[in-house]
C-alpha cells in the first residue's frame, strides 16, 4: 500500500479506483486491480 499526501492523482490512474473514508483516514481501493491501494498520510 502506498502512502501519499494527495490521492486525487492516484485515483485517476485506473477507472475502477474508489475513494473511501474509513476511521478518519482516506483510502483509494480497487477491487479488480489490488495493486492500486493507497492511504493518505
UniProtKB/Swiss-Prot annotation:
Biological processes per GO annotation: translation
Q: Which InterPro entries match?
A: Ribosomal_bL36, Ribosomal_bL36_sp, Ribosomal_L36_bact
Q: Key word Ribosomal protein present in the record?
A: yes
| Region annotation (Disordered) ranges | 1-21
One GO molecular function term of this record is: structural constituent of ribosome
Q: Which Pfam families does the record match to this protein? A: Ribosomal_L36 (PF00444)
- Which keywords does this Swiss-Prot/TrEMBL entry list? Ribonucleoprotein, Ribosomal protein
Q: Which GO terms describe its cellular component?
A: ribonucleoprotein complex; ribosome
Which SUPFAM superfamilies does the record cross-reference, listed alphabetically? Ribosomal protein L36 (SSF57840)
Give the record's family classification.
Belongs to the bacterial ribosomal protein bL36 family.
Q: What is this protein called?
A: Large ribosomal subunit protein bL36
The protein's organism comes out as Methylobacterium sp. (strain 4-46)
Amino acid at each position: 500500500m502506498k502512502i501519499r499526501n494527495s490521492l486525487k492523482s492516484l485515483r485517476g490512474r485506473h477507472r475502477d479506483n474508489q475513494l473511501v473514508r474509513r476511521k478518519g483516514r482516506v483510502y483509494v481501493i480497487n477491487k479488480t486491480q489490488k495493486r492500486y491501494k493507497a492511504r493518505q498520510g
